[in-house]
Amino acid sequence: MRTLWIMAVLLLGVDGSLVQLWKMIFQETGKEAAKNYGLYGCNCGVGRRGKPKDATDSCCYVHKCCYKKVTGCDPKMDSYSYSWKNKAIVCGEKNPPCLKQVCECDKAVAICLRENLGTYNKKYTIYPKPFCKKADTC
């Protein structure tokens, strides 16, 4: 499993907000993001897109749509500030508008993944991209 995690880090990169996103997901779900969601379903992970397989995968689909609305920065590379207070994610007030949007997108997916932990299905953990059907546009 450690090898899978290392491969996911190398494939996905760890700059900017990806590290923050992974931390948020861990804080909300208790799951390591790269290992559990890096290639989950048709939408979780970089470069994946398709009709969601379940509610967990739908969280990632909505997250990708949220990122598409962000302008003025790179959601995957630019860092923002946030804190974990009383078991809640709080996006930093001093973030520029673009990074505030990115933080809110990441916060929403982390909460969505926590709320849908019951739908997490190990059979979708490393789901083959060719099995994904075309998704509706955001």
Curated annotation (Swiss-Prot):
It is found in: Secreted. GO terms for biological process: arachidonate secretion; lipid catabolic process; negative regulation of T cell proliferation; phospholipid metabolic process. Its EC number is 3.1.1.4. Gene3D superfamilies: Phospholipase A2 domain. It holds the Pfam family Phospholip_A2_1. Expressed by the venom gland. Ca(2+) binds at G45, G47. Its cofactor is Ca(2+). Disulfide bonds join C42-C132, C44-C60, C59-C112, C65-C138, C66-C105, C73-C98, C91-C103. SUPFAM superfamilies: Phospholipase A2, PLA2. Keywords: Disulfide bond, Hydrolase, Lipid degradation, Lipid metabolism, Metal-binding, Myotoxin, Secreted, Signal, Toxin. Binds 1 Ca(2+) ion. InterPro entries: PLipase_A2 (IPR001211), PLipase_A2_Asp_AS (IPR033112), PLipase_A2_dom (IPR016090), PLipase_A2_dom_sf (IPR036444), PLipase_A2_His_AS (IPR033113). It comes from the Eukaryota. The active site is at H63, D106. The keyword Oxidoreductase does not apply. GO terms for molecular function: calcium ion binding; calcium-dependent phospholipase A2 activity; phospholipid binding; toxin activity. Is abundantly expressed in Tokunoshima and Amami-Oshima P.flavoviridis venom, but is missing in Okinawa P.flavoviridis venom. It is thought that loss of BP-I in Okinawa P.flavoviridis is due to lack of necessity for a strong toxicity exerted by BP-I in the venom as far as they feed mostly on frogs. This is Basic phospholipase A2 BP-I. It comes from Protobothrops flavoviridis.
